From Swiss-Prot:
GO terms (BP aspect): amino acid biosynthetic process; aromatic amino acid family biosynthetic process; chorismate biosynthetic process
The UniProt record lists the keyword Nucleotide-binding: no
Cofactor note: Reduced FMN (FMNH(2)).
Naturally occurring in which organism (per UniProt): Methylibium petroleiphilum (strain ATCC BAA-1232 / LMG 22953 / PM1)
Ligand binding (NADP(+)): 48, 54
Record-given protein name: Chorismate synthase
EC number: 4.2.3.5
Catalyses which reaction(s): 5-O-(1-carboxyvinyl)-3-phosphoshikimate = chorismate + phosphate
């Protein structure tokens, strides 16, 4: 199946299905000499893994990663790195009632018409389970970017359904199951999800992720713009229906006198561009927001058709996230890291010798 690989110099090929024996990825292009073990990758997978709260799928997968190649005596060799995650808690029988029908809003219908067949067990190749290997690959990219450029990543939920989540500080993100940068609204979010689960329905979310410390100059003009590649990879995340860079769609209501980020010798005065101008990084924080649609696998009966095109009623009884966005923050961080890692290597290959007599200005004013 095409469409399973991303990147130019740091390439990641994803493989597996939701209810197959295992899922994983092959990373081709990781520079040699970096220390790497499963212990460097597992914490990121643990942030994403299912079954960690009552608000997510109760499929209990340990998501224990195995490094099969590309590492010798604790260091990357420069050859392809294969990461494997074995599936241990499949319940394929839960999907028996949808083998002959299509779930509204799901890839069942489009996969059937494209390939002439589909794997109904947990969505097969279209399952969000396939994001786990990308989080593993993202952990490798994060480690290299931090060690070589001091780049850090952070993210959190900005909205759950119709509830806007006020930003109170990134320090709150690890303290709640929603990855919310907020301490005062968690009870409201929990009550909302408890009621939703009883209704047998689902809801969407908005997630914001940032990369700090990205140098100025990464990205390419026109069709390989840094923000274009970011949008491309974010749209590859299951259930994402919208991507914003910086001010995004709010830019429509801005005046040019406000929107353009003014430069001073002391630093930028704002960051409406989200850290990218002309497809090239400015040295400011790269800020990305994604919109995630409601989960399509729900218990609420809905109208559909069967494989013969006849009317059918669909109910889904498998274990699913009532909101895919609850576990999306570490996934979006990983995807952003993969894009930046690829562009870091591309920039080094073409422009690594470029030197200017004047240093870049600060990402923001000292008191900002």
């Amino acid at each position: 199946m095409s469409g399973s690989t991303l990147g130019h110099l740091f390439c990641v090929t994803n493989f597996g299905e939701s209810h197959g024996p295992a899922i994983g990825c092959v990373i081709d292009g990781c520079p040699p000499g970096m220390s790497l073990s499963e212990a460097d990758i597992q914490p990121e997978l643990d942030r994403r893994r299912p079954g960690t709260s009552r608000h997510v799928t109760q499929r209990n997968e340990p998501d224990a990663v195995e490094i099969l190649s590309g590492v010798h005596e604790g260091r990357t060799t420069g050859t392809p790195i294969c990461l494997l995650i074995r599936n241990t808690d499949q319940r394929s029988k839960d999907y028996g009632n949808i083998v002959q029908t299509f779930r509204p809003g799901h890839a069942d219908y489009t996969y059937w018409h494209k390939y002439g067949l589909r794997d109904p067990r947990g969505g097969g190749r279209s399952s969000a389970r396939l994001t786990a290997p990308m989080v593993g690959a993202g952990a490798v990219a994060k480690k290299w970017l931090k060690e070589h450029h001091g780049i850090a990543f952070r993210g959190g939920m900005a909205a759950l359904g119709e509830i806007d989540i006020a930003f109170e500080g990134w320090q709150h993100v690890p303290d709640n199951p929603f990855f919310a940068p907020n301490a005062s609204q968690i009870g409201q979010l929990e009550d909302f999800m408890d009621a939703l689960r009883k209704e047998g329905d689902s809801v969407g979310a908005r997630i914001v992720v940032e990369a700090t410390g990205v140098p100025v100059g990464w990205g390419e003009p026109l069709f390989d713009k840094l923000d274009a590649d970011i949008a491309h990879v974010m749209m590859g995340l299951n259930a994402v229906k919208g991507v914003e860079i910086g001010a995004g769609f709010a830019s429509v209501a801005h005046r040019g006198s406000m929107h353009g980020d003014e430069l001073t010798p002391q630093g930028f005065r704002s960051n409406h561009a989200g850290g990218v101008l002309g497809g090239i990084s400015t040295g400011q924080d790269i800020r990305v927001s994604i919109a995630i649609k409601p989960t399509s696998s729900i218990r609420t009966p809905r109208q559909s058709i069967d494989l013969q095109g006849q009317p059918a009623t669909v109910e889904t009884f498998g274990r699913h996230d009532p909101c895919v966005g609850i576990r999306a923050t570490p996934i979006a961080e990983a995807l952003l890291a993969l894009v930046l890692m690829d562009h870091a290597l591309r920039h080094r290959a073409q422009c690594g010798d470029v030197r200017l007599p004047v240093a870049p200005i600060a990402a923001h004013l000292p008191d900002a």
